[in-house]
Regions:
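Glycine-rich segments within core transmembrane alpha-helices of 12-TM secondary carriers
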Residues: 78, 100-125, 149, 320-333
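Multi-pass alpha-helical transporter architecture, strongest
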Residues: 153-160, 304, 354-380
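Extracytoplasmic gate region of multi-pass secondary transporters
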Residues: 186-235, 329-334
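Extracellular/periplasmic helix-loop-helix junction of adjacent transmembrane segments
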Residues: 1-19
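Cytoplasmic membrane-interface "Motif A"-like loop-to-helix N-cap segments
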Residues: 30-42, 249-260
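Helix-to-loop junctions at the C-terminal end of transmembrane segments
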Residues: 20-33, 240-252
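C-terminal ends and interior cores of transmembrane alpha-helices
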Residues: 42-61, 261-277
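C-terminal transmembrane helical hairpin of 12-TM major facilitator-type secondary transporters
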Residues: 253-300
Length: 380
């Protein structure tokens, strides 16, 4: 039950992502990607600091969990705005023949954040703190580090240049209602939802939930779980730019189809085999295999979605449907998986994850390859 409560708190930030995508997406499309990214990271800094300095329940009672909830809300708003604005910015500054590679590098930062957090935890656990110290106050250190990184990110973003595509489209975009433009592009909004369903559920299955799965279902020790997760994330980081570069050569659609087909056919047997193994090495290889499949989506997700929309609504077009879908199908991965486990039907979650990927496969089948139909140069 404690694991489930923690998962619900984790999901809270996802519920705020759609609102963040609207607020920061509108800001990015009207006033610039750079300013939107600066304010998003400020909000993340405040959210991390609130968690780092939050008093305990014994000190302030009910105000403690309320403070954590507010902090998670701030982080959710920031994450919701960050996705669309950052995916748009990198796609717009990239050379047309290198956008897939840039998209892969962009996803490295998402996985890299989890890898950095895991590294900090390993250092604290093994080198610096005792278990009692970590439980008493050491758990706050990663959030302090996160806040400091946010300050550094703000300093870097302050000196970024606005994209040429935004500056070229700014005058035309100002004459149009973003809501009317979004309505005119409703098919693309639906397409982003379809593209995202399977990918986001798979991503959070093999990242956030996987550590709990390895401990609770596979039966690995804490040390084994940490090492397996660390190695798998490192493997994922290495292959993202490679997959992205491949999409610059053969197009985006083949990679999406590959993820959809292999994910639909392979998720259930892969998770079933993973659950039954007792070997950390086998677990590591299986998760790497999963990443080799999932990366058909993760490595190009930014550029595929960005290429669907004109410049005037690109940040909102990418961010809003993604945030809604991530909240429903990404943020709920842990609660759903833990619910099935608590009911004694853990394989039900395997079928659920398979179904999500199959839904996306239907969209991948009919979508046109965005590399050849890109709207990156369109102002409105």
């Amino acid at each position: 039950m404690q694991q489930l409560n923690a998962a619900v708190l984790f999901a809270l930030a996802f519920l705020m992502r759609p609102l963040g995508s609207v607020l920061f997406g509108y800001f990015a499309d009207r006033f610039g990607r750079r300013l939107s990214l600066m304010w998003a990271v400020i909000l993340m800094c405040f959210g991390s600091l609130m968690i780092a300095v939050c008093p305990t329940y014994t000190q302030i009672g009910l105000a403690a969990p309320i403070t954590l909830m507010i902090a998670r809300i701030l982080q959710g708003l920031s994450q919701g705005g960050e996705y669309g604005a950052s995916a748009t910015y990198l796609s717009e500054i990239a050379h047309p023949n290198r956008r897939g590679f840039y998209s892969g590098v962009w996803y490295v930062t998402l996985i890299g954040g989890q890898l950095l957090a895991l590294t900090v935890l390993m250092v604290l656990q093994k080198l610096l703190l005792t278990p009692d110290q970590l439980k008493a106050w050491g758990w706050r250190i990663p959030f302090v580090i996160g806040a400091l990184i946010s300050v550094y990110a703000f300093w870097m973003r302050r000196d970024m240049h606005e994209t040429d595509l935004f500056k070229a489209a700014e005058s035309k975009a100002a004459k149009q209602s973003v809501w009317v433009l979004l309505g005119q592009n409703w098919k693309q909004l639906v397409m982003v939802v379809g593209i995202t369903v399977g990918g986001t559920s798979a991503f959070y299955t093999y990242t956030t939930y996987m550590q709990k799965f390895l401990k609770l279902s596979v039966g690995l020790s804490d040390d084994q779980t940490t090492l397996v997760t660390f190695g798998a994330l490192l493997f994922a980081i290495i292959i993202q730019p490679i997959y992205g570069a491949i999409s610059d050569i053969i197009g985006r659609k083949p990679l999406l189809i590959g993820f959809g087909v292999l994910g639909t056919l392979g998720t259930y047997p892969l998770l079933t085999t993973l659950q039954s193994t007792k070997s950390p090495l086998v677990a590591f290889l299986l998760i790497c295999l999963a990443w080799a499949i999932v990366s058909g989506y993760t490595s190009i997700t930014a550029v595929v979605k960005a290429e669907l929309f004109p410049t005037a609504i690109r940040a909102m077009g990418v961010g809003i449907p993604y945030a809604l879908t991530a909240a429903i199908f990404g943020g709920t991965v842990e609660p759903i998986a833990l619910y099935f486990k608590n009911q004694g039907f853990e394989s039900g979650f395997y079928w659920y994850a398979t179904g999500c990927i199959f839904i996306s496969l239907m969209f991948y089948t009919f979508i046109k390859d965005t590399k050849s139909t890109s709207r990156m140069e369109d102002a409105v």
